[in-house]
Structures are given as structure tokens and as C-alpha cells.
Regions:
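Charged, low-complexity intrinsically disordered terminal segments
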Residues: 2-426
Length: 426
């Protein structure tokens, strides 16, 4: 064979391999479609809906918690670092993003200092998401006494597992204070969304019995990475009520059947009767979710969706997202592109009653492939606060109109369709 034939054969082989890989992942997604036949509406039958939420999440709604919503790096990082510096017994930290920069160095120092004063510090770092992390930071923490492990490094003999990441963001201090949300340990999350280099995100601080669920999610990833079981009393201290907010943990792990993240999202959409406010950085709904959102709008629910605009770190995901917009807009759903910077939040507010916050993206990867964590917070006050933040974000956004979609042209729409076909691997 001539060199050109070898080259052509290699190209064809690569294309076939890519097709098989995407098809396998797409089939996984197809097995995770949610079609909610019926669910108690949130408003008129709230207690019944909470029981349904329990069934969807696979966790009870836990009473007696204190919850604080933290917007952007200016609020989340001082709170997290303050908790680390005040720690006394344990720090458990799991993150998908840990890059280079000033804030990663500050966290490495704070965690190292904690370990040196006798605190047990454990970190689970996703091996894909932390690819930009300088190894000197990991070495610094290990030398100080921190236990650091990487989740699912690439292994040629088990390469399909590499497709399943831990996307969870969890910080648990002394087993009593927990943080979760969309944050990453990178300078992009610093500030207050004031410029393109400072991203927009939403996170929560939790105290009370619900923190045990965060600890459990961390120990799950730790066990997968190290085969160690964390059962010490220091890891699971006695937790007493500290507030009056009910919270349900959404601990989502890839499985055969719909994941907890997908089930809860489907329940919130199906149960809504008045309003739905969705902020999501990677909004690529499956066909069944497009049906569910359109059905919600058709029955009178006021649906608004906030997505990134000109600043997006995953342009192919943005194209896939845009493929879903025509039908949603046709059914009266408001879609808004955030203009100032990358919008990285992952929140849902349903009927002004329930707020969902966490790492869960509205895409097949979060629903079928990644380990995720979120909390469904039952609080009108916190829901109202988040809606006010959403409305402030809309003022800095541009609404997607039918004319906007039509102006994209055939070539752009064709590329959007191709990206949507490959959505399971974006």
C-alpha cells in the first residue's frame, strides 16, 4: 500500500472509532430518558411533591439546616478559606477544576497549613478537570501531610471509565460545615462577574444535618479512588439542627437508568405550576427534556432560561445548546444570553418554593456520565433571593428572539445540529 492509502485508512479508522464512541455514549443517554407520567404539583400539594422529590433524589428531605447562598468568588472564596483556616479535625475537598493562579496557590497554602497543625486533609482531584494544575501545588500539599488522590486517571486497558468523571464540588470542614455549587479553584472564579476574566457562579454554604450527605458523597469518590473506607467518628460527627431550612441532597452517580440528577430535574419541571427559572452554563437538553419544558410552558408555567453569551469556555457545547432553542422559543420560553462574562451557575428555582444548586449541568454528561452533587433547598426566602439575582442577570443579558434564530443562517444551524448529535461527548 502507498503512504496515501495508509493515511486514508487511518483517517477512516479514526472516524469509525469516533462514531462508535459517540454512539455508545449516545445509547447510554438514550437509556436515561425521563418521561414523567404524573407528579404532585408543587403549589397545591406541596407535601405530596416533597415526597415525590424524596423518591426522585433517593434521599430524604432533612430538616434543621442553615443555608447561605454565595454569589461569585467574592463571596464563596473568603467563606471557604475562612472555614479551612479555622478547621480543627478534618477537611474533605473534592473538585473538578483546580488550575494555576493566585487563588489555587492560596488554597494550597491554607490546606497545607491545616495539615501541618494536625488536621486530617483529604483531596479528591478529577484527573481530567485538574489537567492545568501545577504539580508543584499537589506536591506542596502532600509534603505538608495532605492526602491527595486523582479520580480515574487515564488507563489504556480501561479507557471507557475515563469518560466517567467526578464533577462534584464539595468542601466539608470538621464534618459540620459544607460548601457546594459550581465553583472551581481557579482565578476565573474570583471577583464578582465584573469583567470577562471574572466568571458568574452561584454556590451555597450549609450547616446542620444535611452536611452528612456532603460527607457521604465525598467518601464515595474517596473510596473509588483509594479503596479506603472512611468510617472514623471524626469523619461523621454528631450533627444537630442549626436552622430551619429543609434540604434534600441530590447525589448523582452514573448508573443503569435515570440518574438522581435527571430524576430531580424532571420532577421540578413536571411539578411546576407557576414559574421556572433555570440558570445553566451548559444547557443541552435531551429531546425528552425539550418536550417537558415545552409542556410546562404550554400549561401556563412562566419559563425563563439563562445561558452564557459571547463568553463561553466550550463553544461546541454552545452550538449544541442553540440547536434546542427554536422549539423552546416557539413555545414561549424566554432564553437569555448573559453578556458580561462566562455564566457558570447551575440553579433552578421552581414556583418560588424550591431552589436547586450544585454542580449539575443541564446536559447528557451530567445526567448520564458524571458523578454530580446538588441540594434542593425548600425555602421561599432563598428562592426569592435567587430569583432577584436571576432578574439582575437578565438585565445584563440579551433575549433570544425568533429573529435571532433565523439570522444564524443555514451553515451555522447545520453546525449546531452536528454538535447536538454529538452532545453526549461535549
Amino acid at each position: 500500500m502507498t503512504p496515501i492509502l495508509y493515511l486514508l485508512g487511518g483517517i477512516v479508522g479514526a472516524l469509525v472509532a469516533a462514531f462508535v464512541y459517540i454512539t455508545i455514549a449516545s445509547n447510554a443517554e438514550a437509556n436515561h430518558q425521563d418521561r414523567v407520567l404524573s407528579v404532585a404539583p408543587i403549589g397545591p400539594e406541596f407535601d405530596a411533591f416533597l415526597r415525590a422529590l424524596h423518591g426522585a433524589a433517593g434521599n430524604c428531605v432533612v430538616e434543621g439546616n442553615e443555608v447561605e447562598v454565595l454569589q461569585n468568588g467574592d463571596e464563596i472564596f473568603p467563606a471557604m478559606l475562612g472555614a479551612v483556616r479555622a478547621s480543627q479535625s478534618t477537611i474533605h475537598f473534592s473538585t473538578y477544576v483546580y488550575w494555576a493562579g493566585a487563588i489555587p496557590r492560596e488554597f494550597a497554602k491554607a490546606l497545607s497549613d491545616a495539615a501541618q497543625r494536625g488536621v486530617m486533609v483529604r483531596l479528591v482531584l478529577d484527573s481530567e478537570g485538574t489537567g492545568l494544575m501545577p504539580r508543584m501545588l499537589a506536591n506542596q500539599m502532600r509534603d505538608a501531610g495532605c492526602k491527595v488522590t486523582w479520580f480515574r486517571r487515564m488507563q489504556w486497558f480501561d479507557w471507557m471509565k475515563y469518560n466517567h468523571r467526578t464533577h462534584r464540588r464539595l468542601l466539608i470542614v470538621d464534618g459540620k460545615i459544607g460548601f457546594t455549587g459550581g465553583f472551581g479553584i481557579a482565578d476565573e472564579w474570583t471577583g464578582h462577574a465584573q469583567s470577562p476574566s471574572h466568571w458568574r457562579d452561584t454556590n451555597v454554604l450549609l450547616r446542620g444535618p444535611i452536611v452528612a450527605a456532603l460527607q457521604s458523597a465525598f467518601t464515595d469518590n474517596w473510596n473509588q479512588s483509594t479503596e479506603e473506607l472512611l468510617l472514623d467518628m471524626r469523619d461523621f460527627p454528631r450533627l444537630t439542627p442549626t436552622g430551619d431550612v429543609p434540604v434534600c441532597a441530590v447525589v448523582s452517580t452514573p448508573a443503569n437508568g435515570a440518574s438522581a440528577a435527571q430524576r430531580v430535574m424532571a420532577a421540578l419541571i413536571a411539578g411546576s405550576t407557576r414559574t421556572l427559572y433555570i440558570s445553566n452554563a451548559y444547557f443541552v437538553p435531551t429531546l425528552s427534556f425539550i418536550d417537558a419544558l415545552c409542556a410546562a410552558s404550554d400549561r401556563g408555567v412562566d419559563v425563563h432560561i439563562l445561558v452564557p453569551g459571547p463568553y463561553h469556555d466550550q463553544k461546541l457545547v454552545q452550538r449544541a445548546s442553540r440547536h434546542s432553542w427554536p422549539r423552546l422559543v416557539e413555545h414561549g420560553i424566554g432564553i437569555y444570553e448573559y453578556q458580561p462574562t462566562m455564566m457558570h451557575a447551575k440553579t433552578v428555582v421552581a414556583d418560588g418554593e424550591i431552589l436547586l444548586v450544585g454542580s449539575i449541568n443541564f446536559d447528557p454528561r451530567s445526567f448520564a456520565l458524571n458523578a454530580e452533587f446538588g441540594v434542593a433547598i425548600v425555602s421561599r426566602r432563598l428562592a426569592a433571593d435567587t430569583v432577584r439575582s436571576f432578574e439582575a442577570d437578565i438585565e445584563r443579558s440579551i433575549q433570544v428572539l425568533p429573529a435571532t434564530i433565523a439570522s444564524r443562517g443555514i451553515a451555522n444551524r447545520a453546525m449546531d445540529a452536528i454538535c447536538y448529535w454529538a452532545r453526549a461527548q461535549l
